Amino acid sequence: MNTILAQQIASEGGVEAWMIAQQHKSLLRFLTCGSVDDGKSTLIGRLLHDTLQIYEDQLSSLHNDSKRHGTQGEKLDLALLVDGLQAEREQGITIDVAYRYFSTEKRKFIIADTPGHEQYTRNMATGASTCDLAILLIDARKGVLDQTRRHSFISTLLGIKHLVVAINKMDLVDYREETFARIREDYLTFAEQLPGDLDIRFVPLSALEGDNVAAQSANMRWYSGPTLLEVLETVDIQRAVDRQPMRFPVQYVNRPNLDFRGYAGTLASGSVKVGERIKMLPSGVESSVARIVTFDGDKEEACAGEAITLVLNDDIDISRGDLLLAANETLAPARHAAIDVVWMAEQPLAPGQSYDVKLAGKKTRARIEAICYQIDINNLTQRDVESLPLNGIGLVEMTFDEPLALDIYQQNPVTGGLIFIDRLSNVTVGAGMVRELDERGATPPVEYSAFELELNALVRRHFPHWDARDLLGDKHGAA
């Protein structure tokens, strides 16, 4: 067992008290990214090592693995703590997204170690989609590279506002201040083109030697700023979803018996209280909250990020994929949108193609109307293209088969983010972020008979797990 962990548990008065203390710590999700061999895995290994998060058996195994697979001579190869795939160890690179957890006295952390190779950019986008902060590693010998620009742009595109530029391998440039200053200036010049209001910080460090990672470096007395760990422990993460209006995508209709009907899911943004008036989209039918049910019992109020089940005072027709929001909020379902796309498939994305798209719990079909442009990551300029290739990033116009309740991604990632699914292979082939909504008129609805409408309502009410589509779409009334 980790000796430090055992001491922490003892100081808290036992396992239960320690677990309660952990629950009350704030959580920071961050990723490490950069060009190939900039030291991402080594940095994470150093953080785990210097915060005493490594168990004795792991340390013993690391000594053995460093002799067989290590790239640091007689020193411990801390990257092997993270590079778990056999292919990664043999090639000395990171391929998959590796997640690690650690904590300090001030905060809990979830780290996503993302690949640096361009052909694995899709993996990097996956890792960035749930993070609040990005650590961008730059090799002090090489400076700002194309992949650094690519990862910076993807991070900001996916809504990350806090960037920590870690200028690594300072030991290989004799810890020179002028090298740090030059790279800092180069990156700030590039960052002027990045979208959004960003919080950018710079830390000179050596992940291999431990300089300015968890402790101040004696080799860089000219640097008076915080260490990387101090930045991670103190950065103020203001989540946009906390300030956004209530959004509750229904993931599951919970009906264990005839006396209970609840709507389960994770509150995407805002808050909800018992007694609050809400409405359901796409129908627009209103009701009020009777109960907020959780694993730990009923609550009077729930906040963004909580997994809850809502029980309403009225028996209305709601199924998986519907969206609940405050009754006084206006959100018009849209069939047309401009989407920022990160393409992840070998077959290019082209106009005329159709894909299944999944947004929260909603799944429907969409058609690609046009490729507006592709972003040139080297200079962030827009290029006219006929299709979007693997790892390409661009703006796409799309039409959905049915109206969807969408938000702008930068305002609400849950109700503004979607994935593309190949209809034949069921493989995820792309990620999309809603940029703009187009309120063009929808196609005239099909006229259904009274019998068809009644049958559809009965199926949706009594067999919600069938995920039957509402034939009346956004004009549907109460059941």
Swiss-Prot record:
Binding positions (GTP): 34-41, 113-117, 168-171
Enzyme Commission designation: 2.7.7.4
Any Pfam family: GTP-eEF1A_C
Location of region: G1: 34-41
Keyword Nucleotidyltransferase: yes
Region annotation G3: where it falls in the sequence: 113-116
Region (G5): 206-208
Region (G2): 92-96
Pathway noted in the entry: Sulfur metabolism; hydrogen sulfide biosynthesis; sulfite from sulfate: step 1/3
CDD domains: CysN_ATPS, CysN_NodQ_II, CysN_NoDQ_III
Region described as G4: spans on this chain: 168-171
Enzyme class: transferase
Reactions catalysed according to its record: sulfate + ATP + H(+) = adenosine 5'-phosphosulfate + diphosphate
Entry GO MF terms: ATP binding; GTP binding; GTPase activity; sulfate adenylyltransferase (ATP) activity
Record text on subunit structure and interactions: Heterodimer composed of CysD, the smaller subunit, and CysN.
Main function: With CysD forms the ATP sulfurylase (ATPS) that catalyzes the adenylation of sulfate producing adenosine 5'-phosphosulfate (APS) and diphosphate, the first enzymatic step in sulfur assimilation pathway. APS synthesis involves the formation of a high-energy phosphoric-sulfuric acid anhydride bond driven by GTP hydrolysis by CysN coupled to ATP hydrolysis by CysD.
Name assigned to this protein: Sulfate adenylyltransferase subunit 1
Organism: Salmonella paratyphi A (strain AKU_12601)
